[in-house]
């Protein structure tokens, strides 16, 4: 079972979002998919998963942890206006 912990949390008032860096420890498991990570992070932060955008998941070969760069928007319309189209597609928001 992967363990999620918040490394950094930063409020970005300009874009009406909160930015997170989350460390996922997944010993002897694969790196979590975007959808798996989105479910767990939305549950952990108690937010609507449609307002959660995962920008990237960074893993290094052989290490049992990954870093997830995530953003939680106050309004989904802001996310659709600000985020790149490919990021929205990867998060099933387009």
Swiss-Prot record:
Family (UniProt): Belongs to the eukaryotic ribosomal protein eS24 family.
Residue stretches in coiled coil: none
Organism of derivation: Nanoarchaeum equitans (strain Kin4-M)
Swiss-Prot/TrEMBL keywords: Ribonucleoprotein, Ribosomal protein
Gene Ontology CC annotations of this record: ribonucleoprotein complex; ribosome
Keyword Ribonucleoprotein carried by entry: yes
GO biological process terms, semicolon-separated: translation
One Gene Ontology MF term: structural constituent of ribosome
Domain of life where this protein originates: Archaea
Protein's UniProt name: Small ribosomal subunit protein eS24
InterPro entries tied to this protein: Nucleotide-bd_a/b_plait_sf, Ribosomal_eS24, Ribosomal_eS24_CS, Ribosomal_uL23/eL15/eS24_sf
Pfam family for this entry, one: Ribosomal_S24e
């Amino acid at each position: 079972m992967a363990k999620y912990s918040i490394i950094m949390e930063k409020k970005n008032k300009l874009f009406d979002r909160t930015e997170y860096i989350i460390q996922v420890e997944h010993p002897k498991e694969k790196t979590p998919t975007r959808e798996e990570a989105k479910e767990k992070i939305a549950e952990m932060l108690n937010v609507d998963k449609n307002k959660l955008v995962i920008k990237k998941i960074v893993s290094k070969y052989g290490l049992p942890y990954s870093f997830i760069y995530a953003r939680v928007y106050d309004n989904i319309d802001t996310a659709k206006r600000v985020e790149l189209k490919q990021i929205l597609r990867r998060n099933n928001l387009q």
